[in-house]
C-alpha cells in the first residue's frame, strides 16, 4: 500500500526501472488512483486540452503494423485518398478551433516524410495552423534532420511518433521498422527543438510487464515527452489484430494513473479507443491524470465521441478546457 507521507513520488525522475514501474502498475486500484490524483493536482490544474486529429493522407502505408487499417498489408475496406490540399486542411483546422480544439494534429500514412511538393505542403499547413492561434502537431513517420529543422522553423509545436509497445513485444506487432528507428526519429525531433509526442497502445496481446517496459522507455526520456498518448486497440476487420479483445476499462485507468505518476508534467492523452469507455471510466481517467483528449467525431480511421458529447461530459464533471472559454477562468485549489 502506498504511504502518502513518503517521498517516493515527490521528485521528477528519469531513472525509473521496469520492476518498480510494474509494482506501481499493480498497486491496489484505489491506492494507485489516489497517488496519481495527488501528483496530478500538484503539477497540473484540472484542465483538459482538446486536440483535433485529421488524416491528411489516408491509406497506402508501406509499414506492416498489425493494428492499422492504413497498411498495404491490411485487407480492410478503408478508402485510400491522396494528400488533401493546404486550403482544405486549414478549413478543417478552422472548424476544429470553432468547436473548441486548441491543438490541430495532422496525420500522413507514410513510412517516412517525402520531400518535394508533399513536404512543402506540410510546411504550409503547419504555418497556417499556427497563424490560426492553434498548436500544430504532425505525425508522418520517420524524418531526416533537415526535415525536422524545417518543421521547427515553420513553428511546429509537436511531432508524434509512438513506440506502440515494449521493446520486447515490438516484433509481434511490426517488422518493417525497428524500435531503434523509432527512437532515432524521436531524437531528431528533440534535437530540432520540437516537442515530442510519444506514447503507445494497450490491448495488442502484451502483458503488464510489457506495459511497464514501454513506460520505462517513455519515463526515462529526458525531458519527458511533452504529451503521451495512451491508446487502446480498436480491432479493425482486415488487420492482423482484427480478433483482438476489447480491454477492461480498469486496465486503461491503471495505465493512465501510472503514466501520470512517472511523468508528472506531461500531457497524458486519452486517445484511440475512448469511445469504448463508459462516461464513468473516462471520469476516473481524468481524475487520476488524463489531461488531453482527441476531440471530434473521428480519429484517423476510427470513430470517436462527438464533440457535443465531450463538451457536455467535461462541463458536467467540472474539468476545465480550452483557454478561449470563460468556463476555464475559474481556478482549482491544490492539496
Swiss-Prot record:
Which top-rank group of organisms is this from?
Bacteria
- For this protein, the Enzyme Commission number is 2.8.1.6
Q: Which SMART domains match?
A: BATS, Elp3
| Alphabetically ordered keywords of this record | 2Fe-2S, 4Fe-4S, Biotin biosynthesis, Iron, Iron-sulfur, Metal-binding, S-adenosyl-L-methionine, Transferase
Matching entries from Pfam families are given as: BATS (PF06968), Radical_SAM (PF04055)
Its annotated pathway reads: Cofactor biosynthesis; biotin biosynthesis; biotin from 7,8-diaminononanoate: step 2/2
- How cofactor binds (record note)? Binds 1 [4Fe-4S] cluster. The cluster is coordinated with 3 cysteines and an exchangeable S-adenosyl-L-methionine. Binds 1 [2Fe-2S] cluster. The cluster is coordinated with 3 cysteines and 1 arginine.
Q: What positions does the domain Radical SAM core occupy? A: 46-274
InterPro entries (UniProt xref): Aldolase_TIM (IPR013785), BATS_dom (IPR010722), Biotin_synth/BioAB (IPR002684), Biotin_synthase (IPR024177), Elp3/MiaA/NifB-like_rSAM (IPR006638), rSAM (IPR007197)
Q: Where does [4Fe-4S] cluster bind?
A: 61, 65, 68
Has keyword 4Fe-4S?
yes
Sites where the protein binds [2Fe-2S] cluster? 105, 137, 197, 269
Checking SUPFAM superfamilies in the record gives: Radical SAM enzymes
One GO biological-process annotation of the entry reads:
biotin biosynthetic process
Catalyses which reaction(s): (4R,5S)-dethiobiotin + (sulfur carrier)-SH + 2 reduced [2Fe-2S]-[ferredoxin] + 2 S-adenosyl-L-methionine = (sulfur carrier)-H + biotin + 2 5'-deoxyadenosine + 2 L-methionine + 2 oxidized [2Fe-2S]-[ferredoxin]
Name any cofactors this protein relies on.
[4Fe-4S] cluster; [2Fe-2S] cluster
Q: A single Gene Ontology molecular function, please? A: 4 iron, 4 sulfur cluster binding
Complexes and interactors:
Homodimer.
The similarity comment for this entry is: Belongs to the radical SAM superfamily. Biotin synthase family.
Role noted for this protein:
Catalyzes the conversion of dethiobiotin (DTB) to biotin by the insertion of a sulfur atom into dethiobiotin via a radical-based mechanism.
Put simply, this protein is called Biotin synthase
Gene symbol? bioB
Amino acid at each position: 500500500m502506498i504511504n502518502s507521507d513518503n517521498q517516493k513520488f515527490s521528485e521528477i525522475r528519469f531513472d525509473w526501472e521496469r520492476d518498480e514501474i510494474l509494482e506501481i502498475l499493480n498497486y491496489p486500484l484505489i491506492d494507485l488512483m489516489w497517488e496519481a490524483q495527488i501528483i496530478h493536482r500538484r503539477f497540473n490544474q484540472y484542465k483538459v486540452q482538446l486536440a483535433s486529429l485529421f488524416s491528411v493522407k489516408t491509406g497506402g502505408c508501406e509499414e506492416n503494423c498489425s493494428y492499422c487499417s492504413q497498411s498495404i498489408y491490411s485487407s480492410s475496406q478503408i478508402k485510400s485518398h491522396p494528400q488533401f490540399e493546404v486550403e482544405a486542411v486549414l478549413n478543417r483546422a478552422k472548424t476544429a478551433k470553432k468547436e473548441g480544439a486548441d491543438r490541430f494534429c495532422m496525420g500522413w500514412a507514410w513510412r517516412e516524410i517525402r520531400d518535394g511538393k508533399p513536404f512543402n505542403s506540410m510546411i504550409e499547413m503547419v504555418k497556417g495552423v499556427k497563424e490560426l492561434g492553434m498548436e500544430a502537431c504532425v505525425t508522418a513517420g520517420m524524418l531526416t534532420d533537415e526535415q525536422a529543422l524545417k518543421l521547427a522553423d515553420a513553428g511546429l509545436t509537436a511531432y508524434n511518433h509512438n513506440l506502440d509497445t515494449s521493446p520486447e513485444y515490438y516484433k509481434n506487432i511490426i517488422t518493417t521498422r525497428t524500435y531503434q528507428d523509432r527512437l532515432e526519429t524521436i531524437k531528431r525531433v528533440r534535437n530540432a527543438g520540437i516537442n515530442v509526442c510519444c506514447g503507445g497502445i494497450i490491448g495488442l496481446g502484451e502483458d503488464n510487464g510489457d506495459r511497464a517496459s514501454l513506460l520505462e522507455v517513455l519515463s526515462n526520456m529526458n525531458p519527458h515527452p511533452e504529451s503521451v498518448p495512451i491508446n487502446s486497440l480498436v480491432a479493425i476487420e482486415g488487420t492482423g489484430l482484427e480478433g483482438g479483445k476489447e480491454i477492461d476499462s480498469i486496465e486503461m485507468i491503471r495505465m493512465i494513473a501510472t503514466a501520470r505518476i512517472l511523468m508528472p508534467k506531461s500531457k497524458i492523452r486519452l486517445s484511440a479507443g475512448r469511445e469504448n469507455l463508459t462516461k464513468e471510466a473516462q471520469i476516473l481517467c481524468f481524475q487520476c491524470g488524463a489531461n488531453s483528449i482527441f476531440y471530434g467525431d473521428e480519429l484517423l480511421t476510427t470513430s470517436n465521441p462527438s464533440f457535443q458529447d465531450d463538451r457536455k461530459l467535461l462541463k458536467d464533471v467540472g474539468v476545465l478546457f480550452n483557454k478561449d472559454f470563460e468556463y476555464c477562468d475559474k481556478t482549482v485549489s491544490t492539496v
